[in-house]
Structures are given as structure tokens and as C-alpha cells.
Amino acid sequence: MRRGFTLVELLVVIAVVAVLAAMLLPVLSRARESARKAACQSNLRQIGTAFRLYASDYDGLYPCNGDRNLWMGRNWRVVLQSYLPGGRMQSLPPGYSQPLQVQHSDVLLCPSDERAVQVWERTSYAYSAAFFHAPEQINSLASVLQGSSCANWQAIVRGIQSLPTVPQSEASLVFPAQKALSAEWLSNHDKFSGDCGFWSWDGSANYLFADGHVKFLRRRQIRPAVNSLPDINLTRDGIAGSDYP
């Protein structure tokens, strides 16, 4: 006669399975986050390619952050759509008073950023102000002393407030391999407040540099952090400056 499992044997098997699951779950979680991080880095590389293609079409100039019609969606994320997989921007006549019709590319969304698609920004990535403001403007911004606070200074570097946009040229780059062009955005995705937000990777972020390479860095590794300003927008000397190492 075949003997079945006893209750004790069954409990032992269940306990072993539970222990194995407890050991494997953190490993699987880390593997999932590593995959998301790699996907995020791939996104930034494609964004870097889009910036280079845009510059090649516009005499070596980088795009503006936005214009006076920013509320209608005319910002850097929109003008790059035509250069990104799955993105598209409808051309409109000058002076057209309606919002642009845009098909957004998923490349602008980090896999770990669950809220980016829900808000007007519709991106997980920031565009360094050094590429759309003159160096003297950036030096003025760098005089902000409380960049780590919750003051609404982020609205300035995002181009929403008064500084005029001055698109910079690729020819002005001095250290392309050391100049951060874009990075994961320190944001809570509030619609307009610009309050302090979170870092996707526990105090670290993926950074795209002007030469096209991507590097995963802790925020204190970016040079403005020495003045308590861990943000690529506030690098002294603008596009001619160096952010890392």
C-alpha cells in the first residue's frame, strides 16, 4: 500500500518552500530594478541621439526649453518627438493659438517612474539649463544658496519663469564627456509647485552626457553638489563647464 505524506512531512516541505521564497524574492526584486535601470539608461541614450539629430538639423544648436507658448506644449520634449521612436509632432502655422497635437514617445518615461505619464510634464527626465541659457545666466542661477530646500527654484531652471532662453551651440562644448545634458528628474510631478521630490534609485540617478554616454551616479558625485546644489542645471559656466568627475 502506498504511504502518503504525514502532516509533519508536509509542514517541513511548506517551511522549506517558504524559506526559499524569502531568499529568492529580494534577489528577484533587485533583478527587476536592475532591468528597469538598464531600460532607463537605454532611454537616455536614445534621447541623446535625438538631441544630436535635432542639432544637426538646426545649425548645431540645442533646442529651447520652451517658448512664450509653453502652456500649449511647445517645449524641448515636444520638439524632440519627431526624433524619438513612436513620437510625432504635428506642424502648425506660425501664430496658431491651439495646443500642439503630439504623439508622445515612451522613451521619455523611466520604467520606475509611475506618475510621469499622468501629468503635464509627461517625462521622467530633465534637460540641463546649461544648454538653453547663456553661461552668465547659469552663473546667476548658481548663486541660489538653498537648492536642497523645497523652495520653488525648480520653476526657474525649467524655463517657466523670467530668464530668456538662449539656445547654445555644440561648438561651445568644452568637455562633452563631462557635461550632463539630461538626467532623471528630481520631481514629485506636482503640476505647478516645483516642490522637492524623490530620487528614483535611492539617492542616485542616470545621467546622459553631451557625448552620448550614460552613467549611473550618486547625486553628490555631480559637481554642483559641493554647494548643496545637486542638480545639473546649476553648473557654473554653463555649457562650457564640467559636471563630472
Regions found by a protein language model. Name each.
Residues 2-32:
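N-terminal single-pass transmembrane signal-anchor helix
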Residues 40-245:
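Short, well-structured segments within or immediately adjacent to enzyme catalytic domains
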